C-alpha cells in the first residue's frame, strides 16, 4: 500500500489561534486546490507541535487551551479534513477537566477524512522549563489503524528517547508522525534522531518542525520524511515550506524479512536492567 504524506512547515503566531488556523487551512488549499474537490495529491498532512497556538507562549497556554474532541480548532480542522478528504495531524494545548480542574497537555490530534478525531497523543517527555511547569506528562503510546496505514505519534523531544518509537513499532506502527518545535542550534541532533528512530524500528517517520523566531527561540525547520532504513527521502529548508513524499508501506515487511531484522531478533529477556535504573 502506498500513502502520500505532506509536512507543512510554518511559523505560528504566538497565541493567535484564528490567524494560525487560517494559515493552516490556506496551506491545505495550496496542497489540494482552493475548491471543494477532494484532494488526490496527499493522504496525510502533518503540521508542527502546538501549531494552533505557537510554542513559546506558556503564559497563554491556559487561555488558548481547548477540550477534546469538541475544541474550536478541531471544528475548523475537521471541516478542512472533510473538505479535502485528507487525514490531518496537528498540535494544540489540550485542557482535560476529568480531574475536576483544568489539567493541560501538549497534545497532537489525528483527524480522518471525515473530520472525525481518530485519536490523540499527549507528549510524554516534556522539556524542562515552561513545558514541565505548564503541562502534565502523557503516559500512553497509542497506535491507530487507518485505511492509509498504522499510525503512531510522538512530539518533538520524545524522539530523543528510543523507547517511545520502539513501543509504537512493536504495536504495529508503520508511519510515526512527529510534530515538533525543535530549536537552533540543535539541527544536527534533529537530523540524527529522526533517522535513528526510522532505522531502529524499520518504519517511516514524518517529522514536521516550526520555523522562525518566537521570543528567545529560533526554529530551523528541516522537516523531513525518512524511509525505513533511516535514509531521508525529502527534507525542507529553513523557511515556510511544504514537502511531500509517497511511501510504500509494503516495503517495511520486505525489509524486516531481509537484512533489517531489528524487531525480530530482539533479545528482550536480557533488557530487564533498563527498568531497574
Which residue stretches match the model-derived regions?
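Short beta->alpha transition motifs characteristic of CBS
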Residues: 58, 109, 121-127, 224, ...
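C-terminal beta-strand edge segments of enzyme domains
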Residues: 143-145, 210-277
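N-terminal phosphate-binding loop and adjacent alpha-helix
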Residues: 9-27
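Active-site catalytic loop in hydrolytic enzyme cores
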Residues: 70, 99-171, 183-192, 196, ...
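Extreme N-terminal starter segment of soluble prokaryotic enzymes
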Residues: 1-7
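Short, glycine-anchored, charge-dense loop/turn motifs used at functional sites
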Residues: 5, 110-118, 226-234
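Cys-nucleophile CN-hydrolase/nitrilase-fold catalytic domain and related Cys-dependent amidase chemistry
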Residues: 17, 26-114, 120, 183-203
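CN hydrolase (nitrilase-like) catalytic-core segments centered on the catalytic cysteine
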Residues: 69-89, 150, 160-243
Amino acid at each position: 500500500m502506498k500513502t502520500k504524506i505532506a509536512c507543512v512547515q510554518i511559523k505560528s503566531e504566538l497565541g493567535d489561534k484564528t490567524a494560525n488556523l487560517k494559515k493552516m487551512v490556506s496551506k491545505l488549499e495550496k496542497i489540494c486546490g482552493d475548491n471543494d474537490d477532494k484532494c488526490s495529491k496527499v493522504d496525510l498532512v502533518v503540521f508542527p507541535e502546538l501549531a494552533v497556538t505557537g510554542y513559546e507562549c506558556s503564559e497563554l497556554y491556559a487561555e488558548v487551551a481547548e477540550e477534546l474532541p469538541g475544541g474550536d480548532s478541531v471544528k475548523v480542522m475537521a471541516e478542512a479534513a472533510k473538505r479535502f478528504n485528507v487525514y490531518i495531524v496537528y498540535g494544540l494545548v489540550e485542557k482535560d477537566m476529568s480531574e475536576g480542574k483544568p489539567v493541560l497537555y501538549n497534545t497532537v490530534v489525528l483527524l480522518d477524512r471525515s473530520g472525525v478525531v481518530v485519536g490523540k497523543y499527549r507528549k510524554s517527555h516534556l522539556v524542562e522549563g515552561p513545558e514541565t511547569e505548564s503541562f502534565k506528562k502523557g503516559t500512553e503510546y497509542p497506535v491507530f489503524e487507518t485505511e492509509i496505514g498504522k499510525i503512531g505519534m510522538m512530539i518533538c523531544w520524545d524522539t530523543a528517547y528510543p523507547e517511545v518509537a520502539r513501543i509504537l513499532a512493536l504495536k504495529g506502527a508503520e508511519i510515526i508522525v512527529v510534530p515538533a518545535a525543535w530549536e537552533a542550534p540543535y539541527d544536527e541532533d534533529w537530523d540524527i534522531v529522526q533517522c535513528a528512530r526510522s532505522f531502529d524500528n524499520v518504519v517511516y517517520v514524518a517529522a514536521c518542525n516550526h520555523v522562525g523566531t518566537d521570543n528567545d527561540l529560533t526554529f530551523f525547520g528541516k522537516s523531513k520524511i525518512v524511509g525505513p532504513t533511516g535514509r531521508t527521502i525529502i527534507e525542507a529548508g529553513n523557511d515556510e515550506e511544504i514537502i511531500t513524499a509517497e511511501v510504500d508501506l509494503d516495503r517495511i515487511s520486505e525489509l524486516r524479512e531481509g537484512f533489517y531484522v531489528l524487531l525480530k531478533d530482539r533479545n528482550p529477556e536480557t533488557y530487564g536492567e533498563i527498568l531497574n535504573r
